[in-house]
Amino acid sequence: MAHEVVVVGGGIGGLTAAALLAARGVNVCLLEKESRGGGCAVTFERFGYTFEAGASLYASWQPEEIHARIFAELPVEQPEVRQAAPAYVVRLPDKTDVAVTGSVEEFAETLRAAFPECADAAVNFYREIAPVGEALRRIVRRVPDLRTASFSRRMRASLPEARVARRVLAALNHTAAQHLAKTSTRFRRFIDVQLQIFGQRESNECAYLYATVALMLPLWGMYAIRGGASGLADTLTEAIKKSGGSLRFNAPVLRLAYDEAGRALGVDLLSGERVEATRAVISNLTVWDTYGKLVGASRTPDNARRRIKDLGGWGAYLLYMGLDEEAAQRLPAEHLLTLTDWQEGQSFNPEGAQFMFGAAPEWDTRAPAGKRAVTVSTFTEAEQWFSYHEDESEHEEQDQRTLELWWERMHAIMPELGSGVEMIETASPRTFYSYTRRKLGMVGGIGQSPDVFGLNSLTHRTEIPNLFMVGDTVFPGQGVAGVTQSALIVANEIAPLSKG
Protein backbone atom coordinates (compact mmCIF):
# COMPACT_ATOMS: atom_id res chain seq x y z
CA MET A 1 0.00 0.00 0.00
CA ALA A 2 1.37 3.45 -0.92
CA HIS A 3 0.83 6.89 0.59
CA GLU A 4 2.51 10.22 -0.01
CA VAL A 5 3.75 10.48 3.58
CA VAL A 6 4.13 7.82 6.26
CA VAL A 7 4.44 8.92 9.91
CA VAL A 8 6.08 6.45 12.30
CA GLY A 9 4.88 6.95 15.85
CA GLY A 10 1.69 8.44 17.25
CA GLY A 11 3.06 10.76 19.91
CA ILE A 12 1.95 14.39 19.93
CA GLY A 13 4.57 15.25 17.30
CA GLY A 14 3.53 12.50 14.91
CA LEU A 15 -0.17 13.17 15.39
CA THR A 16 0.26 16.91 14.81
CA ALA A 17 2.35 16.43 11.68
CA ALA A 18 -0.16 13.93 10.28
CA ALA A 19 -3.12 16.18 11.14
CA LEU A 20 -1.56 19.20 9.42
CA LEU A 21 -0.57 17.25 6.32
CA ALA A 22 -3.98 15.60 6.03
CA ALA A 23 -5.68 18.99 6.38
CA ARG A 24 -3.47 20.27 3.55
CA GLY A 25 -4.65 17.49 1.27
CA VAL A 26 -1.67 15.15 1.59
CA ASN A 27 -2.30 11.40 1.51
CA VAL A 28 -0.81 10.54 4.90
CA CYS A 29 -0.73 7.35 6.95
CA LEU A 30 0.26 7.25 10.63
CA LEU A 31 1.55 3.98 12.10
CA GLU A 32 1.54 3.44 15.88
CA LYS A 33 2.42 0.27 17.76
CA GLU A 34 -0.02 0.96 20.62
CA SER A 35 -3.82 0.96 20.53
CA ARG A 36 -4.14 4.76 20.83
CA GLY A 37 -2.10 7.89 20.19
CA GLY A 38 -0.24 10.05 22.69
CA GLY A 39 3.10 8.32 23.13
CA CYS A 40 4.82 9.03 26.44
CA ALA A 41 2.23 11.74 27.17
CA VAL A 42 -0.75 9.37 27.14
CA THR A 43 -2.96 9.07 30.22
CA PHE A 44 -3.95 5.75 31.78
CA GLU A 45 -6.75 4.58 34.07
CA ARG A 46 -6.62 2.77 37.41
CA PHE A 47 -9.40 2.26 39.97
CA GLY A 48 -11.51 5.10 38.64
CA TYR A 49 -8.60 7.52 38.27
CA THR A 50 -7.15 8.89 35.04
CA PHE A 51 -3.49 9.76 35.47
CA GLU A 52 -1.21 11.99 33.44
CA ALA A 53 2.28 10.73 32.71
CA GLY A 54 4.01 14.02 33.46
CA ALA A 55 3.83 17.43 35.09
CA SER A 56 0.42 18.16 33.47
CA LEU A 57 1.09 21.86 32.80
CA TYR A 58 1.09 23.08 29.21
CA ALA A 59 2.43 26.27 27.65
CA SER A 60 1.54 28.33 24.58
CA TRP A 61 -2.24 28.00 24.52
CA GLN A 62 -2.76 31.76 24.21
CA PRO A 63 -4.68 32.91 21.10
CA GLU A 64 -1.56 33.95 19.17
CA GLU A 65 0.61 30.96 20.08
CA ILE A 66 1.51 27.63 18.46
CA HIS A 67 -1.56 25.58 19.39
CA ALA A 68 -3.98 28.21 18.08
CA ARG A 69 -1.94 28.30 14.89
CA ILE A 70 -2.26 24.53 14.48
CA PHE A 71 -5.97 24.29 15.22
CA ALA A 72 -6.74 27.17 12.85
CA GLU A 73 -5.91 24.67 10.07
CA LEU A 74 -7.71 21.64 11.46
CA PRO A 75 -11.36 20.60 11.02
CA VAL A 76 -11.87 20.21 14.79
CA GLU A 77 -12.08 22.49 17.81
CA GLN A 78 -9.11 22.52 20.16
CA PRO A 79 -9.59 20.70 23.48
CA GLU A 80 -10.79 22.71 26.44
CA VAL A 81 -7.95 24.42 28.26
CA ARG A 82 -7.96 26.65 31.32
CA GLN A 83 -5.16 28.74 32.71
CA ALA A 84 -3.66 27.64 36.02
CA ALA A 85 -3.51 30.42 38.60
CA PRO A 86 -0.83 30.40 39.79
CA ALA A 87 1.04 28.36 37.20
CA TYR A 88 2.70 26.62 40.15
CA VAL A 89 4.24 27.27 43.54
CA VAL A 90 7.91 26.59 44.18
CA ARG A 91 8.35 25.32 47.74
CA LEU A 92 11.86 25.64 49.15
CA PRO A 93 13.44 23.52 51.92
CA ASP A 94 12.76 26.25 54.50
CA LYS A 95 9.05 25.98 53.56
CA THR A 96 9.04 29.31 51.71
CA ASP A 97 6.35 29.20 49.02
CA VAL A 98 6.94 31.24 45.87
CA ALA A 99 3.86 31.55 43.64
CA VAL A 100 5.05 31.90 40.05
CA THR A 101 2.43 34.05 38.39
CA GLY A 102 1.58 37.57 37.25
CA SER A 103 3.42 40.23 35.27
CA VAL A 104 7.14 40.75 35.77
CA GLU A 105 6.47 43.78 37.97
CA GLU A 106 3.86 41.95 40.03
CA PHE A 107 6.20 38.99 40.37
CA ALA A 108 8.96 41.35 41.51
CA GLU A 109 7.12 41.92 44.78
CA THR A 110 6.87 38.16 45.29
CA LEU A 111 10.61 37.84 44.72
CA ARG A 112 11.41 40.64 47.17
CA ALA A 113 9.39 38.93 49.88
CA ALA A 114 10.80 35.46 49.21
CA PHE A 115 14.46 36.42 48.72
CA PRO A 116 15.20 39.43 50.95
CA GLU A 117 18.89 38.49 51.08
CA CYS A 118 19.29 39.31 47.35
CA ALA A 119 16.03 41.05 46.48
CA ASP A 120 17.45 43.58 44.01
CA ALA A 121 19.58 40.98 42.21
CA ALA A 122 16.64 38.56 41.95
CA VAL A 123 14.32 41.22 40.56
CA ASN A 124 16.97 42.50 38.16
CA PHE A 125 17.54 38.97 36.85
CA TYR A 126 13.88 38.65 35.87
CA ARG A 127 13.81 42.18 34.46
CA GLU A 128 16.82 41.23 32.36
CA ILE A 129 15.38 38.00 30.96
CA ALA A 130 11.86 39.32 30.29
CA PRO A 131 12.59 41.43 27.16
CA VAL A 132 14.99 38.80 25.79
CA GLY A 133 12.46 36.00 26.26
CA GLU A 134 9.68 38.10 24.71
CA ALA A 135 11.87 38.93 21.70
CA LEU A 136 12.80 35.29 21.12
CA ARG A 137 9.14 34.34 21.43
CA ARG A 138 8.15 36.84 18.73
CA ILE A 139 11.01 35.81 16.42
CA VAL A 140 9.96 32.15 16.55
CA ARG A 141 6.35 33.14 15.83
CA ARG A 142 7.58 34.78 12.62
CA VAL A 143 9.97 31.96 11.67
CA PRO A 144 9.08 28.66 13.41
CA ASP A 145 11.91 26.86 11.58
CA LEU A 146 14.52 29.27 12.94
CA ARG A 147 17.15 26.53 13.25
CA THR A 148 17.20 25.76 9.51
CA ALA A 149 15.91 29.05 8.09
CA SER A 150 18.12 31.00 5.72
CA PHE A 151 20.26 33.84 7.05
CA SER A 152 18.05 36.40 5.30
CA ARG A 153 14.86 34.99 6.87
CA ARG A 154 16.45 35.04 10.31
CA MET A 155 17.53 38.63 9.82
CA ARG A 156 14.09 39.75 8.67
CA ALA A 157 12.51 38.04 11.67
CA SER A 158 15.03 39.67 14.02
CA LEU A 159 14.93 43.23 12.67
CA PRO A 160 11.92 44.30 14.78
CA GLU A 161 13.86 43.16 17.87
CA ALA A 162 16.86 45.42 17.29
CA ARG A 163 16.72 46.77 20.86
CA VAL A 164 17.68 43.41 22.35
CA ALA A 165 19.51 41.84 19.40
CA ARG A 166 22.92 42.83 20.74
CA ARG A 167 22.18 41.23 24.10
CA VAL A 168 21.02 38.04 22.40
CA LEU A 169 24.15 37.79 20.27
CA ALA A 170 26.41 38.47 23.25
CA ALA A 171 24.76 35.67 25.25
CA LEU A 172 24.68 32.95 22.58
CA ASN A 173 27.09 30.72 24.49
CA HIS A 174 26.25 31.81 28.02
CA THR A 175 24.79 29.60 30.71
CA ALA A 176 22.08 30.89 33.01
CA ALA A 177 24.50 30.78 35.94
CA GLN A 178 26.64 33.47 34.32
CA HIS A 179 23.77 35.89 34.96
CA LEU A 180 23.20 34.86 38.59
CA ALA A 181 26.51 36.05 40.04
CA LYS A 182 25.04 38.40 42.65
CA THR A 183 22.22 36.15 43.82
CA SER A 184 21.99 33.87 46.85
CA THR A 185 22.12 30.09 46.96
CA ARG A 186 18.42 30.11 47.84
CA PHE A 187 17.55 32.06 44.69
CA ARG A 188 19.84 29.97 42.50
CA ARG A 189 18.15 26.80 43.67
CA PHE A 190 14.78 28.43 42.94
CA ILE A 191 16.02 28.90 39.38
CA ASP A 192 17.65 25.45 39.22
CA VAL A 193 14.47 23.49 39.93
CA GLN A 194 12.56 25.40 37.24
CA LEU A 195 15.25 25.03 34.58
CA GLN A 196 15.56 21.35 35.41
CA ILE A 197 11.83 20.71 34.95
CA PHE A 198 11.61 22.74 31.71
CA GLY A 199 15.02 22.11 30.16
CA GLN A 200 16.56 19.11 31.97
CA ARG A 201 19.56 21.23 32.96
CA GLU A 202 20.30 23.31 36.07
CA SER A 203 21.63 26.86 35.85
CA ASN A 204 25.32 25.93 35.55
CA GLU A 205 24.54 23.90 32.43
CA CYS A 206 21.39 25.43 30.92
CA ALA A 207 21.75 27.80 27.98
CA TYR A 208 20.93 31.33 29.09
CA LEU A 209 18.79 32.10 26.06
CA TYR A 210 16.74 28.97 26.67
CA ALA A 211 16.34 30.06 30.29
CA THR A 212 14.97 33.45 29.25
CA VAL A 213 12.05 31.70 27.58
CA ALA A 214 11.61 28.79 30.01
CA LEU A 215 11.47 31.00 33.10
CA MET A 216 8.98 33.35 31.46
CA LEU A 217 6.57 30.57 30.44
CA PRO A 218 4.76 30.43 33.82
CA LEU A 219 4.46 34.22 33.87
CA TRP A 220 3.01 34.21 30.36
CA GLY A 221 0.58 31.49 31.45
CA MET A 222 0.46 27.71 31.90
CA TYR A 223 -2.65 25.66 31.19
CA ALA A 224 -4.42 22.42 32.07
CA ILE A 225 -6.10 20.43 29.28
CA ARG A 226 -9.39 18.65 29.87
CA GLY A 227 -8.51 14.99 29.93
CA GLY A 228 -4.80 15.81 30.11
CA ALA A 229 -2.43 15.34 27.18
CA SER A 230 -4.63 12.51 25.93
CA GLY A 231 -7.35 15.10 25.39
CA LEU A 232 -5.03 16.75 22.89
CA ALA A 233 -3.95 13.44 21.35
CA ASP A 234 -7.54 12.27 20.88
CA THR A 235 -8.50 15.59 19.26
CA LEU A 236 -5.60 15.34 16.82
CA THR A 237 -6.60 11.75 16.04
CA GLU A 238 -10.11 12.95 15.22
CA ALA A 239 -8.68 15.69 12.99
CA ILE A 240 -6.66 13.17 10.97
CA LYS A 241 -9.76 11.05 10.40
CA LYS A 242 -11.92 14.04 9.41
CA SER A 243 -9.32 15.18 6.88
CA GLY A 244 -9.18 11.75 5.26
CA GLY A 245 -5.85 10.64 6.71
CA SER A 246 -5.15 7.02 7.54
CA LEU A 247 -4.51 5.84 11.12
CA ARG A 248 -3.22 2.38 11.87
CA PHE A 249 -2.86 1.50 15.53
CA ASN A 250 -1.36 -1.79 16.78
CA ALA A 251 0.97 -1.59 13.79
CA PRO A 252 4.60 -1.77 15.00
CA VAL A 253 7.22 -0.68 12.47
CA LEU A 254 10.35 -2.79 12.09
CA ARG A 255 12.62 -0.64 9.93
CA LEU A 256 12.92 1.86 7.13
CA ALA A 257 12.71 0.62 3.55
CA TYR A 258 15.16 2.03 0.98
CA ASP A 259 15.39 2.32 -2.77
CA GLU A 260 18.58 1.56 -4.70
CA ALA A 261 19.84 5.12 -4.19
CA GLY A 262 19.48 4.92 -0.41
CA ARG A 263 16.38 7.09 -0.21
CA ALA A 264 13.60 6.27 2.23
CA LEU A 265 10.72 4.80 0.24
CA GLY A 266 8.57 3.57 3.12
CA VAL A 267 8.70 1.24 6.11
CA ASP A 268 8.48 -2.47 6.78
CA LEU A 269 6.09 -3.52 9.53
CA LEU A 270 6.76 -6.26 12.06
CA SER A 271 4.01 -8.21 10.30
CA GLY A 272 6.08 -8.29 7.10
CA GLU A 273 3.93 -5.75 5.26
CA ARG A 274 5.61 -2.84 3.47
CA VAL A 275 3.94 0.58 3.54
CA GLU A 276 5.37 2.85 0.86
CA ALA A 277 5.81 6.63 1.02
CA THR A 278 6.20 8.50 -2.27
CA ARG A 279 7.20 11.85 -0.71
CA ALA A 280 8.50 11.40 2.84
CA VAL A 281 8.74 9.33 5.99
CA ILE A 282 8.43 11.19 9.30
CA SER A 283 9.87 9.60 12.43
CA ASN A 284 8.28 10.50 15.75
CA LEU A 285 10.87 8.34 17.52
CA THR A 286 13.72 9.86 19.51
CA VAL A 287 16.89 10.69 17.61
CA TRP A 288 18.57 7.63 19.17
CA ASP A 289 15.76 5.32 18.12
CA THR A 290 15.32 6.91 14.69
CA TYR A 291 18.88 5.99 13.81
CA GLY A 292 19.38 2.95 16.05
CA LYS A 293 16.13 1.19 15.15
CA LEU A 294 14.42 2.77 12.14
CA VAL A 295 17.45 3.65 10.00
CA GLY A 296 19.65 0.85 11.36
CA ALA A 297 23.19 0.97 12.68
CA SER A 298 24.76 -0.09 9.38
CA ARG A 299 23.05 2.75 7.49
CA THR A 300 23.51 5.49 10.10
CA PRO A 301 25.82 8.18 8.65
CA ASP A 302 29.07 8.76 10.55
CA ASN A 303 28.15 12.39 11.26
CA ALA A 304 24.90 11.37 12.91
CA ARG A 305 26.57 8.56 14.85
CA ARG A 306 29.18 10.94 16.25
CA ARG A 307 26.61 13.59 17.09
CA ILE A 308 24.27 11.37 19.09
CA LYS A 309 26.91 9.15 20.68
CA ASP A 310 27.32 11.26 23.82
CA LEU A 311 23.83 12.75 23.97
CA GLY A 312 21.63 11.61 26.82
CA GLY A 313 18.56 12.51 28.79
CA TRP A 314 16.97 11.92 32.17
CA GLY A 315 14.63 9.17 33.16
CA ALA A 316 11.52 9.75 35.24
CA TYR A 317 10.21 7.98 38.30
CA LEU A 318 6.53 8.74 38.86
CA LEU A 319 4.13 8.23 41.73
CA TYR A 320 0.43 8.05 40.85
CA MET A 321 -1.82 8.87 43.78
CA GLY A 322 -5.35 9.63 44.85
CA LEU A 323 -5.87 12.86 46.80
CA ASP A 324 -8.81 13.71 49.06
CA GLU A 325 -10.52 16.95 48.03
CA GLU A 326 -10.18 18.22 51.60
CA ALA A 327 -6.39 17.80 51.39
CA ALA A 328 -6.33 19.43 47.95
CA GLN A 329 -7.99 22.52 49.40
CA ARG A 330 -5.20 22.84 51.97
CA LEU A 331 -2.52 23.18 49.28
CA PRO A 332 -1.38 26.60 48.02
CA ALA A 333 -1.73 25.48 44.38
CA GLU A 334 -2.59 22.45 42.29
CA HIS A 335 1.03 22.21 41.19
CA LEU A 336 3.95 22.40 43.61
CA LEU A 337 7.53 22.28 42.37
CA THR A 338 9.38 21.31 45.51
CA LEU A 339 13.02 21.44 46.56
CA THR A 340 13.76 19.17 49.51
CA ASP A 341 17.48 19.90 50.03
CA TRP A 342 19.58 23.03 49.38
CA GLN A 343 22.56 20.84 48.41
CA GLU A 344 24.92 23.58 49.53
CA GLY A 345 28.54 23.29 48.49
CA GLN A 346 27.82 20.89 45.64
CA SER A 347 26.47 20.81 42.13
CA PHE A 348 22.71 20.59 41.93
CA ASN A 349 21.44 17.02 41.58
CA PRO A 350 17.70 16.82 40.87
CA GLU A 351 17.59 13.09 41.55
CA GLY A 352 17.95 13.71 45.26
CA ALA A 353 16.26 17.05 45.73
CA GLN A 354 13.24 17.94 43.62
CA PHE A 355 9.83 16.73 42.52
CA MET A 356 6.74 18.15 40.85
CA PHE A 357 3.42 17.47 42.57
CA GLY A 358 0.61 17.85 40.06
CA ALA A 359 -3.04 17.48 41.04
CA ALA A 360 -5.78 17.35 38.43
CA PRO A 361 -7.71 20.64 38.42
CA GLU A 362 -10.89 21.03 40.42
CA TRP A 363 -12.89 21.38 37.18
CA ASP A 364 -11.50 18.10 35.77
CA THR A 365 -10.66 15.87 38.74
CA ARG A 366 -10.20 12.61 36.74
CA ALA A 367 -11.05 10.68 39.88
CA PRO A 368 -13.87 9.16 41.93
CA ALA A 369 -16.16 11.59 43.76
CA GLY A 370 -14.36 13.57 46.44
CA LYS A 371 -10.93 12.70 45.04
CA ARG A 372 -8.36 14.03 42.59
CA ALA A 373 -5.79 12.25 40.47
CA VAL A 374 -2.20 13.23 41.31
CA THR A 375 1.06 12.62 39.49
CA VAL A 376 4.35 13.20 41.28
CA SER A 377 7.28 13.46 38.84
CA THR A 378 10.91 12.93 39.86
CA PHE A 379 14.19 12.64 37.98
CA THR A 380 16.24 9.46 37.91
CA GLU A 381 19.29 8.20 36.05
CA ALA A 382 17.65 5.97 33.46
CA GLU A 383 20.54 3.56 32.96
CA GLN A 384 20.50 2.29 36.55
CA TRP A 385 17.06 0.76 35.94
CA PHE A 386 18.49 -1.39 33.14
CA SER A 387 21.73 -2.53 34.79
CA TYR A 388 22.22 -6.20 35.56
CA HIS A 389 19.81 -7.72 38.08
CA GLU A 390 19.72 -11.33 39.20
CA ASP A 391 15.96 -11.53 38.74
CA GLU A 392 12.79 -9.44 38.60
CA SER A 393 12.56 -9.32 42.39
CA GLU A 394 15.60 -7.00 42.44
CA HIS A 395 13.75 -4.56 40.19
CA GLU A 396 10.76 -4.74 42.50
CA GLU A 397 12.99 -4.02 45.48
CA GLN A 398 14.54 -1.05 43.66
CA ASP A 399 11.08 0.28 42.90
CA GLN A 400 9.97 -0.16 46.52
CA ARG A 401 13.07 1.61 47.89
CA THR A 402 12.57 4.52 45.52
CA LEU A 403 8.88 4.77 46.36
CA GLU A 404 9.55 4.81 50.11
CA LEU A 405 12.25 7.46 49.70
CA TRP A 406 10.00 9.85 47.76
CA TRP A 407 6.96 9.12 49.92
CA GLU A 408 8.96 10.20 52.98
CA ARG A 409 10.35 13.30 51.26
CA MET A 410 6.93 14.29 49.97
CA HIS A 411 5.28 14.14 53.38
CA ALA A 412 8.18 16.01 54.99
CA ILE A 413 7.97 18.96 52.59
CA MET A 414 4.15 18.85 52.19
CA PRO A 415 2.71 18.23 55.69
CA GLU A 416 -0.69 19.49 54.50
CA LEU A 417 -1.23 16.15 52.80
CA GLY A 418 -1.52 14.27 56.09
CA SER A 419 -3.44 11.05 55.57
CA GLY A 420 -5.37 12.52 52.64
CA VAL A 421 -3.28 10.87 49.93
CA GLU A 422 -2.98 7.23 48.89
CA MET A 423 -0.57 5.43 46.58
CA ILE A 424 -2.06 3.83 43.48
CA GLU A 425 0.88 2.95 41.25
CA THR A 426 4.44 3.86 40.24
CA ALA A 427 6.30 4.10 36.94
CA SER A 428 10.04 3.89 36.26
CA PRO A 429 12.14 4.19 33.09
CA ARG A 430 11.45 0.49 32.56
CA THR A 431 7.73 1.30 32.48
CA PHE A 432 8.25 4.00 29.87
CA TYR A 433 10.46 1.71 27.82
CA SER A 434 7.89 -1.09 27.83
CA TYR A 435 5.22 1.27 26.53
CA THR A 436 7.13 3.63 24.23
CA ARG A 437 10.34 1.74 23.40
CA ARG A 438 12.25 5.02 23.85
CA LYS A 439 15.95 4.36 24.51
CA LEU A 440 16.36 3.47 28.22
CA GLY A 441 12.88 4.86 28.79
CA MET A 442 14.32 8.39 28.71
CA VAL A 443 11.66 11.11 28.50
CA GLY A 444 11.69 14.88 28.20
CA GLY A 445 14.20 15.25 25.41
CA ILE A 446 17.80 16.44 25.48
CA GLY A 447 19.08 18.80 28.17
CA GLN A 448 19.25 22.35 26.84
CA SER A 449 22.92 23.16 27.33
CA PRO A 450 24.58 25.68 24.96
CA ASP A 451 26.13 22.93 22.81
CA VAL A 452 22.72 21.48 21.87
CA PHE A 453 20.49 24.57 22.11
CA GLY A 454 19.20 26.79 19.32
CA LEU A 455 21.45 26.86 16.28
CA ASN A 456 23.42 23.96 17.77
CA SER A 457 20.37 21.73 18.16
CA LEU A 458 19.49 18.66 16.15
CA THR A 459 17.17 19.54 13.28
CA HIS A 460 14.15 17.87 11.74
CA ARG A 461 16.24 16.94 8.72
CA THR A 462 18.33 13.78 8.48
CA GLU A 463 21.08 12.67 6.13
CA ILE A 464 18.73 9.99 4.79
CA PRO A 465 16.88 11.47 1.78
CA ASN A 466 13.10 11.76 2.37
CA LEU A 467 13.39 11.04 6.13
CA PHE A 468 12.40 13.71 8.67
CA MET A 469 12.09 13.78 12.46
CA VAL A 470 9.64 15.36 14.89
CA GLY A 471 9.55 15.20 18.67
CA ASP A 472 11.33 16.36 21.80
CA THR A 473 14.88 15.46 20.73
CA VAL A 474 14.96 17.86 17.75
CA PHE A 475 14.56 21.65 17.52
CA PRO A 476 13.04 23.39 19.40
CA GLY A 477 13.07 20.73 22.14
CA GLN A 478 11.14 20.05 25.31
CA GLY A 479 7.46 20.17 26.07
CA VAL A 480 4.24 19.65 24.15
CA ALA A 481 4.50 23.14 22.63
CA GLY A 482 8.03 22.45 21.39
CA VAL A 483 7.03 19.09 19.96
CA THR A 484 4.06 20.73 18.24
CA GLN A 485 6.34 23.34 16.71
CA SER A 486 8.63 20.61 15.37
CA ALA A 487 5.61 19.08 13.63
CA LEU A 488 4.66 22.42 12.07
CA ILE A 489 8.22 22.80 10.77
CA VAL A 490 8.15 19.41 9.05
CA ALA A 491 4.65 19.91 7.64
CA ASN A 492 5.72 23.27 6.21
CA GLU A 493 8.75 21.71 4.54
CA ILE A 494 6.86 18.80 2.99
CA ALA A 495 3.66 20.64 2.05
CA PRO A 496 3.96 24.40 2.59
CA LEU A 497 0.77 26.40 2.83
CA SER A 498 -0.05 28.38 -0.28
CA LYS A 499 0.52 32.10 0.27
CA GLY A 500 -2.44 32.78 -1.96
Residue ranges of predicted features:
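Active-site-proximal substrate-binding core of FAD-dependent oxidoreductases
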Residues: Y258, P496-G500
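C-terminal segments that line or cap access tunnels to active or ligand-binding sites in enzymes
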Residues: D324-R430
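A glycine-rich dinucleotide-binding beta-alpha-beta segment and adjacent secondary-structure elements
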Residues: R186-R201, L215, P415-P476
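Mid-domain catalytic core of redox enzymes
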Residues: P252-A369
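N-terminal glycine-rich phosphate/pyrophosphate-binding loop and immediately adjacent elements
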Residues: A2-R141
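Active-site/ligand-binding neighborhood in enzyme catalytic cores
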Residues: A130-S243, Y435-P450
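A conserved FAD-binding loop/helix module that cradles the flavin
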Residues: A55, D472-I494
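A conserved beta-strand/loop element that lines the FAD pocket in flavoprotein oxidoreductases
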Residues: I240-V253
